């Protein structure tokens, strides 16, 4: 009888312990995710949830290669685009911890002969300014993408000819070129490439074995995802983006398992598996608001700002640290709730997709035990990729160009960007940049807009860019103004310089 009672008590104790350990917060999650994947016509994604320094959920969905039906796993590498910025910023934080860099120092202290557009910028912009998007540089992506170099120093030498887009240290203007600059600082200080530094100081210590800084290295692995997009309801394969000299702003490819290690490190004051990787003081600074920004009208969300490679806000009473990534064929998001010791990341192989954010909301509400939304409550927003409609329109007969099309042809130059060329082919004009070629569609008089050439990566929306050709005093085409910045940038025709 005594032995029987002991067995019964042990049985009850085990069941009580099991009842305490069983976590029902994510019950039914996979069914909801699969429903959203179907609704969004998505191909594949990977989800990871870490809590209290442990992985509590890790799952791949769909395919990394649709044609070959290769499944997504937790080790599948996706392009994470601007999520890269937190890695580059951390590299500077590590170097500061080593006493080799000061984030309050000017970049010219480390980069020989480096200059901004004017003395005010040279004197006031610091590495911190660049990391928190308050330098005033803003978007100079046309320079990075259309005129990209394979030499960062050569590319940065152009900045002294480019006007700022905002107030110095008193604005929030997202800037990829800012991260290109700080990545170059790291290279100058260490005499190693940005790629080598990221591998040595972050990937290896965090056991990020399926993370890469280049397409070539990623393709040498046996588990990476292709990129996809949707056009008119149909799925299309999308070319990978090549980052040229702006890799520090967005070139990393990683897996959800690796990002799980990355998030655990941030939630553990910079330590991973008992070893300090990121300085604790830097972790605090990077996840604190360094620059206030307008977050728009978002219900239940307040206090918007940027740290170093991360964005911050207060969501339903929880401090949220996050950053997304969007590039040709991929959309991703990583989010930390530091005071709940919770990290969530979703990597998706769909272009310009809100799907990762919907899944993030589903998981956040479950893990933090907030009111949940039904799947049907989420708006269906599917953004089509940019495609060439193959319908070449003729000239606007009511508002014809002032010159024959052949007179528009030639090379045009700007010191801060470089040289572009206008060529004529089959009665159409094309603009030829160093890295891309776009067909020009006539709008009115001497104004044209760019149209995608089939097969180009989904980096810039060409429809956004207009080319306004201007006549000189002799009535000849002498320059082009292109809306590459807030103020149009003028390229001078070389024969008329």
Model regions and ranges:
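Short, solvent-exposed loop/turn and secondary-structure capping segments
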Residues: 58-61, 140-146, 213-217, 356-357
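Active-site helix/loop module of the DD-peptidase/beta-lactamase fold
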Residues: 79-83, 95-138, 161-163, 184, ...
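Short, charged, amphipathic alpha-helices and their helix-cap/turn boundaries
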Residues: 29, 144-167, 192-209, 229-237
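Catalytic nucleophile serine of serine hydrolases
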Residues: 82-83, 173-176
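Catalytic loop of the DD-peptidase/beta-lactamase superfamily, centered on the K-T-G motif
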Residues: 20-59, 187-200, 204, 239-497
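Second-shell loop/turn segments in exported
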Residues: 21, 77-79, 115-118, 143-146, ...
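Short, conserved catalytic-motif segment at the N-terminal edge
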Residues: 22-78, 100-102, 109, 116-117, ...
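Bacterial Sec-dependent N-terminal signal peptides
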Residues: 1-24
């Amino acid at each position: 009888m005594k032995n029987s009672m002991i067995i019964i008590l042990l049985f009850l104790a085990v069941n009580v312990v099991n009842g305490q350990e069983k976590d029902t917060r994510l019950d039914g999650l996979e069914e909801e995710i699969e429903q959203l994947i179907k609704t969004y016509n998505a191909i594949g994604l990977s989800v990871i949830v870490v809590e209290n320094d442990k992985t509590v959920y890790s799952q791949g969905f769909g395919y990394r290669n649709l044609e070959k039906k290769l499944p997504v796993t937790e080790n599948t590498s996706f392009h994470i685009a601007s999520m890269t910025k937190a890695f580059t910023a951390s590299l500077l934080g590590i170097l500061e911890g080593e006493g080799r860099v000061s984030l309050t120092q000017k970049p010219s202290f480390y980069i020989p002969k480096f200059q901004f557009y004017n003395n005010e910028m040279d004197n006031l912009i610091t590495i911190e300014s660049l990391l928190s998007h308050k330098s005033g540089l803003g978007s100079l992506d046309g320079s990075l993408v259309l005129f990209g170099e394979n030499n960062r120093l050569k590319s940065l030498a152009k900045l002294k000819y480019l006007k700022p887009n905002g107030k110095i240290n008193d604005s929030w203007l997202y800037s990829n070129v800012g991260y290109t600059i700080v990545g170059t600082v790291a290279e100058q200080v260490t005499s190693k490439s940005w790629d080598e530094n990221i591998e040595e100081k972050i990937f290896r210590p965090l056991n990020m074995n399926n993370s890469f800084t280049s397409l070539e290295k990623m393709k040498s692995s046996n588990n990476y995802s292709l990129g996809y997009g949707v056009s008119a309801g149909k799925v299309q394969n999308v070319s990978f983006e090549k980052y040229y000299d702006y890799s520090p702003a967005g070139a990393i490819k990683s897996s959800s398992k690796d990002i799980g290690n990355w998030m655990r490190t941030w939630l553990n004051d910079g330590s991973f598996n008992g070893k300090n990787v990121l300085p604790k003081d830097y972790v605090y600074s990077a996840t604190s608001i360094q620059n206030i920004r307008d977050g728009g009208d978002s219900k239940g969300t307040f206090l918007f700002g940027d740290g170093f490679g991360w964005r911050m806000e207060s969501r339903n009473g929880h401090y949220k640290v996050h950053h997304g990534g969007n590039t040709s064929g991929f959309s991703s998001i990583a989010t930390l709730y530091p005071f709940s010791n919770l990290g969530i990341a979703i990597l998706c192989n769909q272009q310009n997709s809100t799907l990762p954010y919907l899944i993030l909301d589903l998981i956040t509400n479950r893990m933090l035990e907030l009111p949940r939304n039904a799947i049907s409550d989420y708006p269906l927003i599917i953004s089509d990729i940019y495609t060439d409609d193959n319908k070449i329109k003729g000239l606007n007969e009511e508002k014809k160009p002032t010159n024959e099309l052949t007179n528009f042809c030639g090379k045009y130059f700007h010191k801060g960007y470089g040289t572009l060329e206008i060529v004529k082919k089959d009665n159409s004009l094309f603009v030829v940049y160093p890295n891309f070629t776009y067909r020009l569609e006539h709008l009115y008089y001497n104004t044209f807009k760019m149209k995608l050439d089939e097969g180009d990566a989904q980096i810039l929306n060409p429809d956004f860019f207009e080319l306004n050709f201007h006549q000189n005093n002799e009535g000849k085409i002498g320059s082009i103004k292109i809306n590459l910045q807030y103020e149009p940038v003028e390229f001078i025709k070389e024969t008329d310089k």
